[in-house]
């Protein structure tokens, strides 16, 4: 398993968040991977997640050492390297139409608040849980709100051969402190997608709070 270094999708993502080192659109952090090994369904998805989180652990350690150099031991020691236990992660297959569903905007008020014709709405009952893909992309905590056209454009570039040959899994998010921020309020999500037509994986992570 290895990261895809160059892809047209990265250029698109940079238009949405030019200052980020990650490939972010809204609150969705995208990781594109490919593998020399044959695709074996769910075990391959788990391998893709393991690769992504190994890289995130390395980055968290690097960030801690950078903080040590810049701000000293006291500050750096308050930072903890990322921890995860993928053996605790549970996966459920997702229907394509459910995953890629995108509502229409029915109203936008003076302050920029948006109303959709979707059945799902953020409330106290679903606070800190998994949010729909469309919501994570279109309703970030800070910064610009994206529109249904953006949702469509992002996925057309990400999956240029269409969605018919995609295998999608939704994962629980109680197996890594990466998701702690999202559990506080906005939401935490982990999805893995395998595109049979392109023989590549897309791991999508969401974890945000105010």
Where are these regions (language model features)?
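Extended, low-hydrophobicity segments enriched in charged/polar residues
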Residues: 1-162
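Acidic, proline/glycine-rich low-complexity IDRs
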Residues: 144, 148-210
């Amino acid at each position: 398993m290895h990261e895809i270094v160059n892809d047209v999708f990265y250029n698109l993502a940079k238009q949405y968040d030019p200052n980020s080192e990650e490939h972010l659109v809204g609150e969705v952090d995208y990781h594109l991977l490919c593998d020399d090994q044959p695709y074996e369904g769910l075990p391959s998805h788990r391998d893709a997640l393991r690769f992504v989180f190994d890289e995130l652990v390395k980055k968290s350690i690097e960030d801690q050492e950078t903080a040590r150099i810049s701000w000293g031991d006291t500050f750096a020691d308050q930072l903890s390297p990322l921890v995860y236990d993928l053996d605790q992660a549970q996966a459920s297959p997702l229907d394509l139409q459910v995953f890629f569903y995108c509502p229409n905007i029915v109203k936008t008020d003076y302050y920029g608040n948006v109303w959709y014709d979707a059945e799902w709405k953020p409330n106290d009952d679903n606070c800190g849980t998994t949010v729909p893909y469309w919501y994570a992309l279109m309703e970030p905590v800070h910064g610009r709100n994206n529109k249904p056209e953006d949702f469509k454009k992002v996925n057309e570039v990400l999956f240029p051969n269409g969605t018919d040959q995609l295998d999608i899994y939704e994962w629980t998010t109680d197996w890594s402190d990466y998701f702690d921020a999202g559990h506080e309020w906005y939401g935490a999500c982990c999805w893995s997608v395998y595109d049979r037509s392109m023989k590549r994986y897309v791991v999508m992570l969401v974890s945000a709070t105010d």
